[in-house]
C-alpha cells in the first residue's frame, strides 16, 4: 500500500544511506570529480568546509592537498566510514550552518541536490566564508536523471498517488541558481550545466536501491519489490542497450563563486 510521502519541500527530508551500497554503486561520483576538484584548487593551510562529505573520499583528497578540512554530513553510516579514514567530520544539518567567517572555501560535490532548502544553504555558506572566500560545487542540475524522475512520477500516479510528491531532488537551472548565489552576496565566476552520459558499473536495480531509497521507503513489501521491478521495466528501453549495459543521463550544475567583500 502506498504510504504518504513527507512534504517534499521540507528541508530536512532525509535519504537513508547504506555505506556498503554507496561504496559499490556510487563510486562513479568520486571518479568523475576531477574537474570540480581542480576548480576548487585547495591550497596548503586553507580552512575548507566539505558540505555533504559522505564517506570522506574527496575530503581526504582536500586534506592531502595540505588544507585544514572539516566535512559535514547528515548520514551516520557514511560519517562512520569517513572517521575510519581519520578525517575531521561531524554530523550537521547544512540548512542550519552556524559558522561565521571561519572558512576560506566551501566545497560540495553531488550533495546539494539532496538539500531542499537552497536559500538556507547558500545563506549559511555566505556567513561561513571569510570575505573573498570561495564557494565551489557540482550537483544535479535541470534535466538530471530525467527518465528516472519521470518513471518515479508515473509509478506513483499509477498507484493513485500524487506524482508531484514523488521526487525530492532539487535540480535548478543555471539562471535560478546563479540568481540565488548573487542574492546572497556572491560574485559568480563560473556556472554551467554539464551533460554527462554515465555508464553504470552495476545494474539499474542496484543504482535505484542506493540513490532512490527515499522513494521505495514509501511502499511496503511485497509492493516495494514490485515497484522496483516496474521502474526497471520502464527505464530499460531508454537506458539499457542490447548487451544489457545501463547508462544514466546525468546533468550536473557546476559553479564557482566568491563572497564579495563587505557583503
Identify the meaning behind each predicted range.
Residues 95-106:
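A short acidic, Gly/Pro-enriched loop at the edge of an enzyme's catalytic core
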Residues 119-134:
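A short glycine-rich, Lys/Arg-flanked "PGG" loop and its adjoining helix->strand segment in the class I
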Residues 1-46, 57-61, 78-81, 136-159:
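Conserved class I S-adenosyl-L-methionine
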Residues 170-184:
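Short alpha-helix
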Residues 189-243:
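C-terminal helical/coil "lid" or tail adjacent to the Rossmann-like core of SAM-dependent
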Residues 49, 54-97:
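Class I SAM-dependent methyltransferase SAM/SAH-binding core
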Residues 105-118:
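A short SAM/SAH-binding and catalytic strip from SAM-dependent methyltransferases
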Amino acid at each position: 500500500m502506498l504510504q504518504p510521502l513527507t512534504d517534499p519541500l521540507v528541508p530536512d527530508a532525509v535519504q537513508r544511506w547504506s555505506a556498503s551500497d554507496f561504496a559499490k554503486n556510487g563510486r562513479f561520483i568520486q571518479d568523475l570529480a576531477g574537474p570540480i576538484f581542480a576548480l576548487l584548487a585547495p591550497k596548503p593551510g586553507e580552512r575548507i568546509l566539505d558540505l555533504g562529505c559522505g564517506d570522506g573520499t574527496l575530503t581526504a583528497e582536500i586534506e592531502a592537498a595540505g588544507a585544514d578540512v572539516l566535512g559535514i554530513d547528515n548520514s551516520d553510516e557514511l560519517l562512520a566510514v569517513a572517521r575510519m579514514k581519520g578525517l575531521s567530520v561531524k554530523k550537521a544539518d547544512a540548512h542550519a550552518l552556524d559558522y561565521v567567517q571561519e572558512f576560506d572555501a566551501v566545497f560540495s560535490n553531488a550533495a546539494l541536490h539532496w538539500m531542499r532548502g537552497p536559500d538556507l544553504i547558500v545563506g549559511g555558506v555566505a556567513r561561513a566564508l571569510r570575505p573573498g572566500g570561495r564557494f565551489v560545487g557540482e550537483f544535479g542540475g535541470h534535466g538530471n536523471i530525467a527518465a528516472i524522475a519521470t518513471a518515479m512520477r508515473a509509478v506513483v500516479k499509477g498507484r493513485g498517488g500524487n506524482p508531484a510528491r514523488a521526487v525530492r531532488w532539487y535540480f535548478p537551472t543555471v539562471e535560478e541558481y546563479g540568481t540565488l548565489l548573487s542574492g546572497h552576496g556572491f560574485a559568480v565566476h563560473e556556472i554551467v550545466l554539464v551533460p554527462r552520459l554515465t555508464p553504470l558499473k552495476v545494474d539499474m536495480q542496484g543504482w535505484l536501491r542506493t540513490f532512490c531509497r527515499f522513494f521505495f521507503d514509501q511502499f511496503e513489501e511485497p509492493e516495494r519489490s514490485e515497484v522496483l521491478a516496474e521502474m526497471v521495466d520502464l527505464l530499460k528501453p531508454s537506458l539499457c542497450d542490447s548487451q544489457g549495459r545501463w547508462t544514466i543521463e546525468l546533468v550536473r550544475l557546476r559553479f564557482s563563486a566568491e563572497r564579495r567583500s563587505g557583503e
